[in-house]
Each structure stands twice: as structure tokens, then as C-alpha cells.
Amino acid sequence: MSTIPISRTNSGGKVKGFWTPIPPKFPRIFFLLPLFCLSSLAVAQTNLSSYTPGSTYWGRNNYTEYIAGNMPLIISAPHGGDDYPSELPNRTNTSTYTVTTDPDLWTANLARAIRTACSNRYGRYPHVIICNVHRAKVDCNREIVEGAQNNTNTQTVWKEFHAYINIARQQVTNTYGRGLYIDLHGHGHPIQKNEIGYDLSDSDMFKTTFSTTDDNESSIHALSERSRQSFTDVVRGELSLGSLLEKRGYPCVPSVSSPNPGVSNGVTNAYFNGGYNTQTYGTSLANGGTIDTIQIECNYTNVRAKSSTSSYSEDVAVRANFASNLVASLEEYFKYHLEMTMDTQATPPPSVNSFSDKTILEDGFTSTSSINLASASNTFWGESSDPNIVDASGFIFGGSGTSRNLVVRPRANAYGSNVIVMVYQQATNGGVGTDWYYLTVDPVNDAPIFPSLSNRTINPGVSLTIPAIATDVEGASLGYALVSGPAGCSVNPSTGTFTWRPTIAQSGVTYPVAIRATESGTGGLSSTLNFQTTVNSATAPQVSTSWISGDAQSSPQVQLSMNGQLGPDYLVWASEDLVNWFNLGTATPTTFPFVWTDANASQYPKRFYQIRLGP
């Protein structure tokens, strides 16, 4: 079959060089992709089921390579080839354009690493298209006139590459309804940042807020229309692809930290915003379609290779690490903006209700959100971006049949802003759709919290110490006061420690105790700790006497052996006439029997003893 390539031109009729920054907005001209003449591939495009996920399909002389996938993700590496076949002439400059021949080193390897990362994570494969021919021979990110010039064999390589892209796009569309195509490149700019291209010009990138026209002409217009975020946030907000990669340690532009390329010495820093592939296959309003396209221009250090002097094994590890983090970032990106999981297995994924952002007070509940299931057999669940604020137990689902609902209950005393509440719905055929909203939990001033405290039972005379220390969620300093309690007790005003030693007179009674903790400052909240302390009844001691150290003529001593209750003081009193009593001493035994010795007993013809309890 014969085909006529149609090139995008500028107003002067000259073929546009897509390696240069995109000029001010211009009318979009559709590019009709010519099918190359190999009958096997031409037939294959109408028989998509002949491509087995995970299998590799080759173009002529293995110049192009298609690894079929079963995910809504397409990866291409048009400039990663290093084959230098003599049958293909080197491309040359013309009067209308200057060719770029530098390859994007290691991008083919990086594309394979991304495929491996997907396989490791999901057991599934992205669609991968690689041009194995050196860029000096063919450029598959330019229109065919510049990319293949006038050589028939070179044009075949170019056509094969783009036919494989269309096969992958059709596979994704047929299977999932929508998806993402990433055109993988490598830049040599001195600033080591990944450059994420959405077909926005340099002047666009310096805008504070993108316009509707910018959105309509971007390569992710369909995704932007689906996302609950503004186009500006989709491009460089906290959930943009650049920011998701950056939080994993890979600086990117645009992102929250680098919303535009920046300026050095009065000159805008170099930034590749997209090329022929993003303009041709992106979902601009003019192009239509549902396969959004992003160009990623990877920096060299710690992305495509460890360094210019590192070993091959070190470089392999670096690429594997970046690929793993890119896949993790894309997993989030799909859920936030494409409303599907990256490992969804059906077309189209079930739709989840759109939710409004919610703001509640700490320790409260959200209002009820309706969830309409496509089928009563579908399953649904939720997760949050911050389990410290909303954990799995905080998702309370209700309803029945296809009419379900959700209430979210944050953890006690937890608060924070912009917590992402994600809801999933999975169909029986494996399709998984998503939607989400921001939950803000505003803090409230909580009263101090005392730890739980059991009632106490003690003997009279036992010193009771209770560290009744309260905590304050907001970290306010606390003061303590005794609200009520038995005579003789006290509370430390700074530490809240309660102390008391009950007297004998207080035995046999249960005493309520109340301690108040109050936040410092005017209007501080307070809490009260209540508990009871029971003082056992005092029991009379048992006493026996004995003589030691000889007879009365050799200064004998009297020993008093006592058994009784631990806690009280034991006061030994003596008298010679049972009228006048005097205290011989006081002891607080820690064990029984307890022995008291009267060393002066032999001085008296008779002596009486009495044991009294105190205090």
C-alpha cells in the first residue's frame, strides 16, 4: 500500500522542528499516521487478540520492538537505540531544519526496567515500544520527513514504531477505555531534574494559573477533564506526576518545588516540554481520544545511570530503583487523575461517585456520602493518605444492594488538613475504579486526660502516693488542685501527685477523692479524677513478754514480741503504777513479729507495758 505522510507545518509552510520549545499557540493540524507496508503488521492491527501480553514482536531486522502488555500504561523509547545499520543512511541537515542525532542514553534499558518494575509489583505488563536504531539514522519523535527523510528502509522503521504505538493505544482503549502513554527520553541539561512535558510552552510554564486554552491544548486534556483537581494542580500541584516523583527523591519540573524551569543569569533554563509524539498522541481538545500522553525527559545522574564513571551493574541498580519509584508514583497518579487503578482488569472500570471535600471537627464524623454500585456484586473499600488521622477502622460503610454509603471517623484526638480519602469499587470482572476527596479535621481544645485509676484499699498508717498525672493533647501546661479528700491528704500543684497517710482515727472508713487538672491560661479546660480509698479497720496488736540475759541480780532485760497490722506506728508506753504512763519509743515495723527490748526493766520492782497504735 502507498501512503502520503502529512506533516504539521507552521504558518510559513515549513516543517516544524519539534526539538525546539513550542512556539506561541498555533492551530492544531491532525497528523494521519501512515501504516507501513509490512503485511504482517498491517493485518495485526485489525487482529489485536493475536498479541500475547509479555511477548515481544519485532519489526524488520529487529529495528523496532513491541512488548505487548495487559495494563493501561504504554511506554516508548524512541531515542534509546544503538544499532547502526549501514543500509540506513545518516540523517542530514536541510534548509528547513537541523537534525538532532544525539541518542538518549540508557532510555531503552530504562523502559525495560519500568516493565520489570510493573511485573514485580502487579504481575502484569505495560505496553513497551522501543526503536533499536541509533538516532543518527532515524528519529521516531519527529514527523516522518525529518525523522526518516527520504530513505524507504528508514521510513519503514519510523512507520513500524508508530504502528506499534497505535496498536498499543488501541489495545488499551479496547480493554480499559482510557490509559496513559509515556514517551521516555533523556536530556543533557546541567540541571539534574526530570522534565515532565505536557505540551505546554515555556511562556505557559511561567504562568501562575493555566488558562482553559492551555488545558485544551495540553497532551493530558482528557485526564484533566476527569480529574477532580484544577489543570494547574494536575500539572504542578502536590498530586502532579512531578511532585509524586519528587517526594520519592527525584527532583522534577514542573512540581510544587519547581513550578517552572526557572531562570539563570536572565535566561530561561532549558526544558523539554514535549515533542512530536506528545503532540500527535496526546488528548488535546483537537486530537480527542482517551489515552493521555506525557513526555518524561530523564536526567542522567541517579536516574539513567549512577554517574558517568559508574559500573554497568551500578547503573542497572540505579535504573531499577528509579523504575520502581516511577511505577509507585504512577500508581498514585492513576488513582488521583484517571479514576482507576493501574492494575485494573476490565473496561471500563466502574465509576465511583464524585465526592465533595469535607471539613469536620476533631473527634467528629463526616456526613454520609452516597456510593452507587454498578452492581450489587461489586465490592468497595477505602483508604486514607494518613493512617495516623484516618485508619482502616475509620471507614464505616452502610447501605445495601447497589445503594451504599460511607461515613468516615478519624482517630481520637487526631487532626490535620488535606487528608486524601480514597474510595475503590471493584467489579466482578476485575475492573477497579476510584474517586477521592480531601478531608480536613480541624483541631479542638481537648480537656486534660487522666489515666484510668482503680480504687485503693490500705491499712491505717500506710503512706499512699498516687502519681495522678494528666496529659493534654495540645501540650498545654497543667496545674492541679485537690477538690475533695480526707483530712491530711494533699496534691502537688505542679505534678498532680496525691499523698496521704491515714490516721488510726480514720480507719474503717471509705473516703472519696477528687483531683482537678486545669490547662494554664485564661479559659483553660479542666478534668477531674475521681477515686475512692478505703482504710481498713485497725486491729489490736498481740504482745508477749520474756526475760533475757540472766536473773534479776544481773540486770535482766524485758523483750516485748509483737504481732499485728502493717502500716500503723507502734508506740511502747510504760508505767509503774498504772496511773502515770510515759513513752519508751515508737517504731513502724515492716515485718512481724517485731521485738522491742526494754534495757532498763531491772531498775524497777515492777513495770507495766502498753502498746498504742498511731498516728
Can you name each region flagged by the protein language model?
Residues 45-344:
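N-terminal catalytic or cofactor-binding beta/alpha core of small enzyme domains
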Residues 347-351, 445-449, 489, 496:
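Proline-centered linker/hinge motifs at extracellular inter-domain junctions
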Residues 348-385, 389, 411, 433, ...:
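Extracellular ectodomain surface segments
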Residues 388-411, 487-503:
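Strand-loop-strand motifs at the edges of beta-sheets in extracellular beta-sandwich domains
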Residues 417-419, 431-437, 511, 524-531:
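Extracellular and select intracellular beta-sandwich modules with Ser/Thr-enriched
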Residues 425-431, 518-525:
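Short, solvent-exposed loop/turn segments at the edges of extracellular beta-sandwich modules
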Residues 439-445, 533-537:
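Interdomain boundary/hinge segments at the C-termini of tandem beta-sandwich modules
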Residues 536-615:
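Short, composition-biased motifs enriched in small/polar/acidic residues
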